[in-house]
């Protein structure tokens, strides 16, 4: 049964690459803690011809939100964060332009009012934590925090992550907190919030197909400068998902 499943998955990968426009694919599945599917195909880097293998690391969008929220829950469990206190209690600079009453709960539930990326953001600036959180703190909210939802497709990590960093008695960088408090205790070896130099050669490079432009519309607010990323939200002004 396992062998037939592996064959089915590999066939699907081959079709995705050969007929559906995928460049590189990797699939792993576990059953009762045992790795039963471990298939891959295609390229991890079109420019060099490097192939995908079992050690290739893929950027997986939004999975880090779960780790970020878990990090905050750890702080709450330790009594370092109260979900119903304002974010500005822990991060005073955030409490500007009407964001002072937005709570940690609002941040966790995408109701804090800052769903868009900073204007002028670049891939390099996205890697500058202090720049990102400084720019987010200076933002005017798109709506009064707590009154509606605006999905934080990208800003969630910096908003919630900065609360974690500010409440960490050791003030560790957020990526270090994730490694030391979540990944290492659980034996997770290949999940990163910020890629170390020695790991970077294993990371697959994302590419947009030129014949498949993003279907999303709206104000990209700086994300257009980031290769492979799009920040629209249906037809809603400013790319906000009004859930």
Where are these regions (language model features)?
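Short, conserved catalytic-motif segment at the N-terminal edge
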Residues: 2-60, 82-85
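Hydrophobic (often cysteine-bearing) scaffold residues that line and stabilize catalytic clefts
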Residues: 5, 9, 60, 64, ...
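Positions in alpha-helical segments
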Residues: 11, 70, 89, 158-162
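Short secondary-structure junction motifs
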Residues: 22-24, 78, 82-84, 136, ...
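Non-cleavable N-terminal signal-anchor transmembrane helices
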Residues: 30, 34, 41, 59, ...
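Short, well-structured active-site flanking segments
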Residues: 36, 67, 73-92, 167-195
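Short, surface-exposed loop or secondary-structure junction motifs
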Residues: 45, 97-243
């Amino acid at each position: 049964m396992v062998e037939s499943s592996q064959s089915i998955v590999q066939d699907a990968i081959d079709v995705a690459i050969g007929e559906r426009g995928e460049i590189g694919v990797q699939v792993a599945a576990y059953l009762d803690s045992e790795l039963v599917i471990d298939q891959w195909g295609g390229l991890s880097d079109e420019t060099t011809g490097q192939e995908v293998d079992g050690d290739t690391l893929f950027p997986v969008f939004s999975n880090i939100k779960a780790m970020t929220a878990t990090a905050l829950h750890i702080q709450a469990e330790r009594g370092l964060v109260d979900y119903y206190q304002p974010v500005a209690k822990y991060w005073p600079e955030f409490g500007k332009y009407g964001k002072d009453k937005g709570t940690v709960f609002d941040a966790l539930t995408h109701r804090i009012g800052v769903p868009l990326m900073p204007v002028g953001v670049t891939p390099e600036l996205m890697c500058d934590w202090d720049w990102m959180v400084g720019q987010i703190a200076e933002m005017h909210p798109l709506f009064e925090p707590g009154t509606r939802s605006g999905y934080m497709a990208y800003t969630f990590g910096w908003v919630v992550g900065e609360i974690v960093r500010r409440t960490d008695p050791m003030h560790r960088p957020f990526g270090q907190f994730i490694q030391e408090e979540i990944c290492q205790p659980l034996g997770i070896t290949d999940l990163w919030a910020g890629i170390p130099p020695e790991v970077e050669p294993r990371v697959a490079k994302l590419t947009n197909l030129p014949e498949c432009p993003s279907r999303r519309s709206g104000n990209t607010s700086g994300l257009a400068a980031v290769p492979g990323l799009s920040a629209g939200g249906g037809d809603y002004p400013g790319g906000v998902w009004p859930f």
